Amino acid sequence: MFTYTVIILLIAALLSAIALFIVHRMPAFKLLFQILYALVMVVLGIFLVTRIMKPINFKTERIRRENAAIERLKDIRKSQESYKNKYGKYTASFDTLLNFIQTDSFEISKLELRGEWNQDEMTQEQAIKEGILRKTIIKKSVRDSLFTPDFNINDIRYIPYTSNTQEFVMKAGEVETGSQLRVKVFEAYALYDILFNGMDPQEVINYKDQRYKITEFDGVKVGSITEANNNAGNWEK
């Protein structure tokens, strides 16, 4: 952008010099040339402003889209972790995950003290057996536990700004840690080429190169199926 700006300024300076020369040598054409000169300068000014605003506009739209994708990936992570807490594994299927959110429930234990309980002399199990503690199991829907009533669950699978035509890629698996423990893992991601579709191609390429040097990935992603990373998002790097 800097090179283009310099070129435009040089052209403007050259035109100004030519204008002064012609006005001095050909006074009869002074008014006509002033009009033409003004029009040319307006066009150059518009072009210059456009060049300056181009990366600014890209950054604004890029941040908007990327933040929307990150929020949706956080919702996927929250749902996946709840699914694993109940079933001991992650799922690679959005249909399974959405069905879990919409139809499943959590069991919540509630303890009610009904007498004097000396915890140094009696365990919780003994207190329940003796009737000193009353244990009640209640169920709460997964949806109500994780999301607000107005949240559209069905949108969770779709990459923002794709008119619900492109889904996040989601995978699940198992990896072995350095201490030889088998750990359940998952990942979900959106490639920048899809997330930034319709935006300036060169600006997209520049941003992809910039982020790849940091994350070694051409998109925004949560989790990993190649390593246990505690379901971290690569936007945190």
Where are these regions (language model features)?
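Membrane-interface helix-boundary motifs at transmembrane edges
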Residues: V23-Q34
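N-terminal alpha-helical signal peptides/signal-anchor transmembrane segments
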Residues: E66-Y87
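Low-complexity, acidic interaction segments enriched in glycine
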Residues: K84-K237
